[in-house]
Amino acid sequence: MKRVFLFLITNLAVILVLSFSARLLGVDRFLTSNGLDLGMLLAFAALIGFGGSFISLLMSKTMAKWSTGARVILRASNEDESWLLNTVRQLSKKADLAMPEVAIYEGAPNAFATGPSRSKSLVAVSSGLLRSMDRKQVEAVLAHEVAHIQNGDMVTLTLIQGVVNTFVIFLARVFAYALDSFLRRDEDESGSPGIGYWISSIAFEIVFGILASIVVMYFSRKREFRADAGAAALIGDRRPMIEALRALGSIDAGKLPKEMAASGIAGGGMMALFSSHPPLESRIAALESAR
């Protein structure tokens, strides 16, 4: 969940900055100078949407380290760190990947993988995960994260987010223009849009962005099943991954970070639509039924 959450937050921030910069440069004024030019607007939305998404991807590893306080293991200082490095190295070799950076951060049981490409990636595990699981289970979690890198999930997420961003920016400005035109219906509409357009376009971007995250989260849940299967393939046995998921499910939900509710520990109903992970029971069932 952490890698997806960080990506979405970074993406939203970048999009808002790019959109605001475009306003300062007069792009919106140009698009609406003779009525709303939908063709030009779509091109502008795609440029900002995909640009923001790829900027977020390039920043993903740096943001992850900064937000978690993760410490990259450059040289093992104890037996646990040595085991972590060797395990990730072996799994990466099996996955035909370059050795990713390996980091540890303080926190409740969790792990994530991120990075702009398969050759420039990061695998991070929390101290809580290392304390609460045995090594076979931790190896399965590491294999799951390596499988995310092998499957190119961050790049896939970036492309999906780029498409979503494009429609969010496009629709936000269409709705904002319509609202501004309605508010100014008794005035001279030959000039540039009024203050209603500037305020409402930002508001619509935020609201549509939150709603559009449902689409991104849906694809994220699908990729989790693939990463589970990939972990089983890398280890050569699905049982360690199943045991790791069961161990995660047995941990007191109160001891988990809030984002781990998305892994199926807690939550449901409408909130499940905003979850980046399927329920643990569904993931275990998928592994057990795999052949």
UniProtKB/Swiss-Prot annotation:
Keywords: Cell inner membrane, Cell membrane, Hydrolase, Membrane, Metal-binding, Metalloprotease, Protease, Transmembrane, Transmembrane helix, Zinc. Its cofactor is Zn(2+). It holds the Pfam family Peptidase_M48. The active site is at 145. Its EC number is 3.4.24.-. PROSITE patterns: ZINC_PROTEASE. GO terms for cellular component: plasma membrane. It is an enzyme of class 3 (hydrolase). It comes from the Bacteria. Its main location: membrane. GO terms for biological process: proteolysis. NCBIfam families: PRK05457.1. Belongs to the peptidase M48B family. This is Protease HtpX homolog. The gene is htpX.
